């Protein structure tokens, strides 16, 4: 029997846990992330996000109206000092089916990337190939990653600032060859809530030391900027995420998304914001109620 929370859990902790389960279930329902018969490879780094994702999926597995299989996976990249025993011991104690994959990507990254440069890009590409191969070997058709709402917003700004693109992390993505769907069940979950939950669960966290000082990374700078905005005006990060879910192509400038050249004068368009007020009463994307069975049944089961 899987132990979902500590024996001495407070009411506030249980409320937080239920909130995270609800947000995870809602994201899964909104994007149809999980279907009957799925085998899901749950990627575990040993950080707070992947631990939380696994626990949310295990909780939902017990009450979901569909049957799906979970296989936890950790990639041991042979970093010096990496505590290789921690995740296997935890997953065995939890009673979760798992696979530990050993691959010395650390040496490759150190050989290819000059000292002091960011290793994330190459490391990510190497990890991705190994994850896809492992999913194929295990017969998984879905790959679950632990990215949360704040990761998605940070990625939007990273791509705008450094790539001149309005591009974030989709909650669900088909791989290039169409073999797998990559899903992000924590897409609706705030990082601060995940951090609080992880502290309450006392997960055996494994820090990421491969990249060196995280403060020097572009992502950390964007994270600091967003945290400053959030302190100045609470709720701003969530509003940005809601905007990602509520795009109006006719009010942007991408000719691939909207046919500006052949736009008919007789066609009714939304009011130009230059001449009208900002729509403060627009329906937030996260309040949309799906008629899909997963979320309807999920809500019924936790009531």
Swiss-Prot record:
The note on the cofactor says: Binds 1 [4Fe-4S] cluster per subunit. The cluster is chelated by three Cys residues, the fourth Fe has a free coordination site that may bind a sulfur atom transferred from the persulfide of IscS.
Known cofactor(s)? Mg(2+); [4Fe-4S] cluster
According to UniProt, this protein's pathway is:
tRNA modification
Query: Which compartment or compartments is the protein found in?
Result: Cytoplasm
Q: Which reaction does it catalyse?
A: cytidine(32) in tRNA + S-sulfanyl-L-cysteinyl-[cysteine desulfurase] + AH2 + ATP = 2-thiocytidine(32) in tRNA + L-cysteinyl-[cysteine desulfurase] + A + AMP + diphosphate + H(+)
Q: Which UniProt keywords apply?
A: 4Fe-4S, ATP-binding, Cytoplasm, Iron, Iron-sulfur, Magnesium, Metal-binding, Nucleotide-binding, RNA-binding, Transferase, tRNA processing, tRNA-binding
Query: Where [4Fe-4S] cluster is bound, by residue?
Result: 120, 123, 211
Provide a GO biological process annotation.
tRNA thio-modification
Short motif PP-loop motif, span: 45-50
Task: Name the principal localization, coarsely classed.
Answer: cytoplasm
Q: What class of enzyme is it?
A: transferase
- A Pfam short name: ATP_bind_3
Q: Which Gene3D superfamilies match?
A: HUPs
Q: What is its EC number?
A: 2.8.1.-
- InterPro entries named among the record's database cross-references: Rossmann-like_a/b/a_fold, TilS/TtcA_N, tRNA_Cyd_32_2_STrfase, tRNA_thiolation_TtcA_Ctu1
Q: Name one GO molecular function term.
A: ATP binding
Print the miscellaneous field: The thiolation reaction likely consists of two steps: a first activation step by ATP to form an adenylated intermediate of the target base of tRNA, and a second nucleophilic substitution step of the sulfur (S) atom supplied by the hydrosulfide attached to the Fe-S cluster.
The UniProt subunit note reads as follows: Homodimer.
Known function: Catalyzes the ATP-dependent 2-thiolation of cytidine in position 32 of tRNA, to form 2-thiocytidine (s(2)C32). The sulfur atoms are provided by the cysteine/cysteine desulfurase (IscS) system.
Instruction: Provide the protein name.
Output: tRNA-cytidine(32) 2-sulfurtransferase
